[in-house]
């Protein structure tokens, strides 16, 4: 079978939105180029349905523009790829990468030996999801976990994606992790990566629109690395599922909306205890106020 590489040129703050569109129309994974000209690439079979797929992508991009969410330039390019090249391209694109002081993200096909005694590998299969653990927002979240986890905590990972934050939390000693994502396809993606990491075998993954379908006793930590507009909707949901004094770790927040998200956090009884920034992305550690 031959494949076509479909690339969408976009901008930094729209990467995850564009990636989600490509996944929704049938991609098994995406590649993100966020170094020079920003683009997101996905692979689709070169068959009679390809035209419909590209049309669906165009419509989704136009819809975002119509509702005021800019993904410009949003130009689409298509290039033919042979089956072998498509398979090899994933492996050529991803290699083991140190992402924080303690963590290295390792593709599942690479044999990797830690260079330091305190180094913690996270095994990921990047073919399955765009959250491979190397994007700035994910680095911010893993660093936040390194800062706050003491061991034995309970945690919810909202919008788990590849499951990378759930694995990192277990590596650091979090006792109980519940991970959520929007649908069964996303849940299966996370489960595949969790199976690659023995420490995360007991992580529970469920389909839920943010926390709407989560019924659980309040936890010590809630983490979320998702789109900023979704974070705004999530914040009020966290307050009933987080223990008083518990911590909410959040990223996926671009420069131009960071101050607004800070206001939303404060309006929902959070105190911001740490702000972090990597490039144009912001991350926060916020503490839920104790009840009087």
Swiss-Prot record:
Name of a matching Pfam family: PrmA
Reactions catalysed according to its record: L-lysyl-[protein] + 3 S-adenosyl-L-methionine = N(6),N(6),N(6)-trimethyl-L-lysyl-[protein] + 3 S-adenosyl-L-homocysteine + 3 H(+)
Main location: cytoplasm
EC number: 2.1.1.-
Cited SUPFAM superfamilies: S-adenosyl-L-methionine-dependent methyltransferases
A single cellular component GO annotation: cytoplasm
Molecular function GO terms recorded: protein-lysine N-methyltransferase activity
Domain of life assignment: Bacteria
Keywords recorded for this protein, A-Z: Cytoplasm, Methyltransferase, S-adenosyl-L-methionine, Transferase
Gene3D superfamilies: Vaccinia Virus protein VP39 (3.40.50.150)
Matches recorded under InterPro entries: Ribosomal_L11_MeTrfase_PrmA, Ribosomal_PrmA_MeTrfase, SAM-dependent_MTases_sf
Residues the entry annotates as binding S-adenosyl-L-methionine: 138, 159, 181, 225
Annotated GO biological process: methylation
Localization in the cell: Cytoplasm
PANTHER family listed in its UniProt record: ELECTRON TRANSFER FLAVOPROTEIN BETA SUBUNIT LYSINE METHYLTRANSFERASE
Family designation: Belongs to the methyltransferase superfamily. PrmA family.
Purpose of the protein: Methylates ribosomal protein L11.
Entry-linked HAMAP family: Methyltr_PrmA
NCBIfam families, A to Z: prmA
Protein's name according to its UniProt entry: Ribosomal protein L11 methyltransferase
Gene: prmA
């Amino acid at each position: 079978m031959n494949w076509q590489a479909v690339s969408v040129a976009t901008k930094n703050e729209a990467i995850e939105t564009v990636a989600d569109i490509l996944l929704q129309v049938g991609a098994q994974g995406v590649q993100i180029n966020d170094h020079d000209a920003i683009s997101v690439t996905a692979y689709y079979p070169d068959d009679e349905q390809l035209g419909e797929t590209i049309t669906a992508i165009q419509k989704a991009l136009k819809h975002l523009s119509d509702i005021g969410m800019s993904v410009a330039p949003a130009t689409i390019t298509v290039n033919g790829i042979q089956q072998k090249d498509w398979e090899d391209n994933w492996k050529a694109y991803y290699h083991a990468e140190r992402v924080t002081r303690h963590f290295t993200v390792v593709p599942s096909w690479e044999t990797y030996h830690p260079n330091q005694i305190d180094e913690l590998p996270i095994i990921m299969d990047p073919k399955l999801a765009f959250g491979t653990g190397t994007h700035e927002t994910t680095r911010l979240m893993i660093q936040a976990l390194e800062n706050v986890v003491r061991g034995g905590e309970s945690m919810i990972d909202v919008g788990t994606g590849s499951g990378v934050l759930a694995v990192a939390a277990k590596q650091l000693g979090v006792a109980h992790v519940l991970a959520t994502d929007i649908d069964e396809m996303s849940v299966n993606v996370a489960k595949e990566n969790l199976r690659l990491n023995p420490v995360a075998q007991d992580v529970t993954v469920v389909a839920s629109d943010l926390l709407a379908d989560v019924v659980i006793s309040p936890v010590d930590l809630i983490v979320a690395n998702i789109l900023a507009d979704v974070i705004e909707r999530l914040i009020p949901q966290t307050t009933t599922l987080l223990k008083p004094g518990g911590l909410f770790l959040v990223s996926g927040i671009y420069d131009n909306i960071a101050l607004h998200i800070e206001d939303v956090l404060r309006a929902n009884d959070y105190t911001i205890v740490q702000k972090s920034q990597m490039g144009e992305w912001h991350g926060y550690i916020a503490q839920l106020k104790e009840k009087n």
